[in-house]
Regions:
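Beta-sheet-dominated scaffold domains
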Residues: 1-2, 8-9, 16-25, 32-38, ...
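Blade/loop signatures of beta-propeller domains
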Residues: 43-59, 94-100
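Catalytic phosphate/metal-binding cores of nucleic-acid and nucleotide-processing enzymes, i.e., regions
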Residues: 63
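Helix-loop-helix junctions within predominantly alpha-helical proteins
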Residues: 66-67
Length: 188
């Protein structure tokens, strides 16, 4: 099963066929990640929800919790090792599968730095890089978001008129991993 979220729509691709995977009575998702057999969703109101284990079509309306360490908008969820990371506009929360019912995950840790652009989040060398709410590029190192951008990149981010539209691309070449971000009229 492959899960896709775009424009508030959740689609499951299975056997080459795409089918809607969301109940219209539930709050539309803004992103999806995979962890421990669950597809995990972010919702703009700060909720995190998930499917049944190993079943992208099974969604329990009570299987949710709130990323609420900070009263910010939930921007994106991503899976990283045994964690689901909930990127808020001003915070990041680590959630771990504890087998709870109906919601399987429990908050494990949180930091007070957020994500300015959901499309900037990318897996890089077994961690996540992203554009932070202070308009710098950061890489997670354990539970710390380490600044990796130089002043030229910081200036490009500060001058971007639509920070939320920044997107990232990663690739590997000759043993090196690259992370590039693109704004309205620039790429670094």
């Amino acid at each position: 099963q492959i899960a896709v979220v775009c424009g508030g729509q959740y689609v499951v691709i299975e056997g080459g066929v795409a089918r809607p995977g969301w109940d219209d009575d539930l709050i539309p998702p803004t992103s999806v990640a995979f962890s421990d057999g669950y597809f995990v969703f972010s919702h703009e109101d700060g909720r995190i929800s998930h499917t049944g284990n190993d079943d992208a079509h099974s969604i329990d309306g009570l299987a949710y919790s709130a990323a609420e360490i900070s009263p910010d908008k939930l921007v994106r969820v991503m899976g990283l090792q045994q964690y689901v990371l909930a990127f808020g506009a001003r915070s990041i929360e680590w959630w771990v599968d504890v087998g709870g019912d109906p919601f399987a995950f429990q908050r494990d840790f949180a930091i007070q730095i957020g994500c300015a652009a959901s499309g900037s989040c990318a897996l890089v060398n077994q961690t996540i890089a992203f554009v932070a709410d202070d308009l710098t590029v950061r890489v997670l190192n354990g539970h710390e978001a380490v600044k990796v951008s130089n002043l030229a990149v910081d200036r490009a981010l500060a001058s971007e008129g639509d920070v939320a539209s920044i997107v990232a691309k990663t690739w590997r070449s000759r043993g090196h991993i690259f992370y590039a971000i693109s704004g309205t009229d620039w790429t670094w």
